Amino acid sequence: MSQTFLAFSRPSIGDEEIAAVTRVLRSGWITTGPECQKLEEEFAARVGARHAVALSSATGAMHVALLALGVGPGDEVITPSQTWVSTANMICLLGATPVFVDVDRDTLMTSAALIEHAITPRTKAIVPVHYAGAAFDLDPLYALADRHGITVIEDAAHAAGTAYQGRPVGQQGTAIFSFHAIKNMTCAEGAMLVTDNARLADRVRQLKFHGLGVDAYDRLTLGRKPQAEVMEPGFKYNLADINASIARVQLQRLDAINAQRQALASHYLERLANSPVLPLALPRYAQQHAWHLFILRIDPERCGLDRDAFMKALQARNIGTGIHFIATHLHSYYRKRFPDVRLPDTEWNSSRLCSIPLFPDMSLDDVERVVGAIESTLESSH
């Protein structure tokens, strides 16, 4: 009898999350309100940030953060191509130009040294990515950005619970976390922007709710002020209390969730140590990995088949996989707009990346099942 399908990711939702949603539904206030306020306070306390603003998605958060910084036509924003397309999309939609930099072949993260070569007088911001749960090497980057007077916005979508040099990601500067369904903590869709810049926080809060001079939920009047006026055109990126209530429970569970992810990842690393598949390398500097993803590189010369054939073979064995990600500059729009971009290490990885199952409700037996499927696939390819 064939085994049931094992997805590459699945949210961990329990009775506490269900009870939290039920409580909000019965409260009579289901959109942005007290749950969202408490989530902001609790998340800021968790990472040691001065300000936290909840939003409906990390894409929306990146949009208003870049806009709040004044990014627009004629500006450049440096970011790796090896990431999800939303950052580059937002840069382009603001009329600015994404400047793509290469990554380390084995960690998939760029570096201050690579970024420095891309800085020009038009550089307005730098968006580094904490990849797959590992921390970006922040100290050299912030030193570089300070020398040039350039703002950094950390893409921390993969980094809930990640730490760098003993400090939680999000403690310094500005960072954006995602609460999408496959992330370490989720509320289906949602995000948190944290920052030590009070003016930026106020502008983001205004832009994410129609440009009104007050938030969707006024903390002083416990409602919406009737005299609220539009201070500038804005958007509708506020997070509902239904979602915030789930995120609050998930935040309380985050340490346990990440500990289970760590245990599963450690077992994968041990079992795949002598396999021709290539897991991502761990950064050499001090950091605490949140293990959002477990990524392999399927090199045809080592494995005897390419990534797509490998994924198809695992699917036939009822094992789900994912790709994180096809490099941004290789997507159709960006190929046409930036035909001369060449990023050798990014491109080498883009055709080889494969994410295998990793989520907190998995067991070590599930890991063994995945490893067994990988081994039988490789044996068949030879």
Curated annotation (Swiss-Prot):
Annotated positions of the N6-(pyridoxal phosphate)lysine modification: K183
Top-level taxon in the UniProt lineage: Bacteria
One of the GO biological process terms: lipid A biosynthetic process
A cellular-component GO term for this protein: membrane
CDD domains: AHBA_syn
GO molecular function: pyridoxal phosphate binding; UDP-4-amino-4-deoxy-L-arabinose aminotransferase
Record's keyword terms, sorted: Aminotransferase, Antibiotic resistance, Lipid A biosynthesis, Lipid biosynthesis, Lipid metabolism, Lipopolysaccharide biosynthesis, Pyridoxal phosphate, Transferase
Pathway of action: Nucleotide-sugar biosynthesis; UDP-4-deoxy-4-formamido-beta-L-arabinose biosynthesis; UDP-4-deoxy-4-formamido-beta-L-arabinose from UDP-alpha-D-glucuronate: step 2/3; Bacterial outer membrane biogenesis; lipopolysaccharide biosynthesis
Cofactor(s), by name: pyridoxal 5'-phosphate
Class of this enzyme: transferase
Catalytic activity: UDP-4-amino-4-deoxy-beta-L-arabinose + 2-oxoglutarate = UDP-beta-L-threo-pentopyranos-4-ulose + L-glutamate
EC number(s) recorded for this UniProt protein: 2.6.1.87
Keyword Ribonucleoprotein part of the UniProt annotation: no
Family to which the UniProt record says this protein belongs: Belongs to the DegT/DnrJ/EryC1 family. ArnB subfamily.
Biological role stated in the UniProt entry: Catalyzes the conversion of UDP-4-keto-arabinose (UDP-Ara4O) to UDP-4-amino-4-deoxy-L-arabinose (UDP-L-Ara4N). The modified arabinose is attached to lipid A and is required for resistance to polymyxin and cationic antimicrobial peptides.
Subunit structure, as described in the record: Homodimer.
Official protein name in the record: UDP-4-amino-4-deoxy-L-arabinose--oxoglutarate aminotransferase
